[in-house]
């Protein structure tokens, strides 16, 4: 009986050791953190900080709308297996069809334990006429200062889950935020030199509020957010009437939306569409705008050029 008791203790000890080993994700164990990001922008910021220390899966494909998405079986599997999940929050993946809320519930994941909003700490801007939870404008990353907040939040959670690589994450965070900060300062100087009467960024979706606040360029749009009606005759008429009262030289259309409504606005106002710009997604790998940094630099350059015409 005593021998049986000893064997039982040894067995339980082995199980405990195995459990501890399997739960530890660091360089010494040879196991990488399994990390999921909801879209390509968050995934790219994560990659810049974590490098090859993690296995990373991005849910919403490049070029697709993250407001309303239907997760694939692979997304469900990766989310269930993930050690760490990063999502934007502030009404992006949890608005519309609330696809992310359903995904993490099905995966039995817990907020602020398994999944984290990278927008934590951002000064939230709300949709026009709204000021309540669920009515936030989610496009905070279009202000580079917020992009730096995202990066810091991501690094914080990576370090918490994988402390053995703390110095690696901190060094990458420092280098990355310095790079973003330099671009941010250059952009503010660039937009200061554009005449006030030309300062109006016109897009299909009203997603440039954070950009407008950061760089002093007011914005106008056809529809406010991609979860509502998009490009109705009434929406187009309202924008056309507004633009006829301005001297704005150029229009812009986002890479992830149907460009036909903006083409109608352009025809009705004789204002050309200057460029396609990025909002909800980076570009395909190898193309201009295929990272958060390069998409923001591209946007800033093209918008400044278009408004200087």
UniProtKB/Swiss-Prot annotation:
InterPro entries with a match to the protein in the record: AdhesinB, Bact_metal-bind_prot9, Lipoprotein_PsaA-like, ZnuA-like
Keyword Lipoprotein in record: yes
Localization: Cell membrane
Single GO MF descriptor: metal ion binding
Pfam families assigned: ZnuA (PF01297)
Domain of life the protein comes from: Bacteria
Topology term for the membrane: Lipid-anchor
Lipid-acceptor residues (S-diacylglycerol cysteine): 20
Annotated signal sequence range: 1-19
Lipidation (N-palmitoyl cysteine): 20
SUPFAM superfamilies: Helical backbone' metal receptor (SSF53807)
A single GO BP: cell adhesion
Record-level GO cellular component terms: plasma membrane
Key words of the record: Cell membrane, Lipoprotein, Manganese, Membrane, Metal-binding, Palmitate, Signal, Transport
CDD domains: PsaA
Residue spans crossing the bilayer: none
Predominant cellular place of this UniProt entry's protein: membrane
Residues annotated as binding Mn(2+): 67, 139, 205, 280
Coiled coil: none
Its job: Part of the ATP-binding cassette (ABC) transport system PsaABC involved in manganese import. Binds manganese with high affinity and specificity and delivers it to the membrane permease for translocation into the cytoplasm. Also acts as an adhesin which is involved on adherence to extracellular matrix.
Similarity comment text for this entry: Belongs to the bacterial solute-binding protein 9 family. Lipoprotein receptor antigen (Lrai) subfamily.
Name of this protein: Manganese ABC transporter substrate-binding lipoprotein PsaA
Protein's organism: Streptococcus oralis
């Amino acid at each position: 009986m005593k021998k049986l008791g000893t064997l039982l203790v040894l067995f339980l000890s082995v199980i405990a050791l195995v459990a501890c080993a399997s739960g530890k994700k660091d360089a010494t164990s040879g196991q990488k953190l399994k990390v999921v990001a909801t879209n390509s922008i968050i995934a790219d910021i994560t990659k810049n900080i974590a490098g090859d220390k993690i296995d990373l899966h991005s849910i919403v494909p490049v070029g697709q709308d993250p407001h309303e998405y239907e997760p694939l079986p692979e997304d469900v599997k990766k989310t269930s297996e993930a050690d760490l999940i990063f999502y934007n929050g502030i009404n992006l993946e949890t608005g519309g069809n609330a696809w992310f809320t359903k995904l993490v519930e099905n995966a039995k994941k817990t907020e602020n334990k398994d999944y984290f909003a990278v927008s934590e700490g951002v000064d939230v801007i709300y949709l026009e006429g709204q000021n309540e939870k669920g009515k936030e404008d989610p496009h905070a990353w279009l202000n580079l200062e917020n992009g730096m907040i995202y990066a810091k939040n991501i690094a914080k959670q990576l370090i918490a889950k994988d402390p053995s690589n703390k110095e690696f994450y901190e060094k990458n965070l420092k280098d990355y935020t310095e790079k973003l900060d330099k671009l941010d300062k250059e952009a503010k100087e660039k937009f200061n030199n554009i005449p006030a009467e030309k300062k109006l960024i016109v897009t299909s979706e009203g997603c440039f509020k954070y950009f407008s606040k950061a760089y002093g360029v007011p914005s106008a749009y056809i529809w406010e957010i991609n979860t509502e009606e998009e490009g109705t005759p009434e929406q187009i008429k309202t924008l056309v009437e507004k633009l006829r009262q301005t001297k704005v030289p150029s229009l812009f259309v986002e890479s992830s939306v149907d460009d036909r409504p903006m083409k109608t606005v352009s025809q009705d106002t004789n204002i050309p569409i200057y460029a396609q710009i990025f909002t909800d997604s980076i570009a395909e790998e190898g193309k201009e705008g295929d990272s958060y940094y390069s998409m923001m630099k591209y946007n800033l350059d093209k918008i400044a050029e278009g408004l200087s015409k």
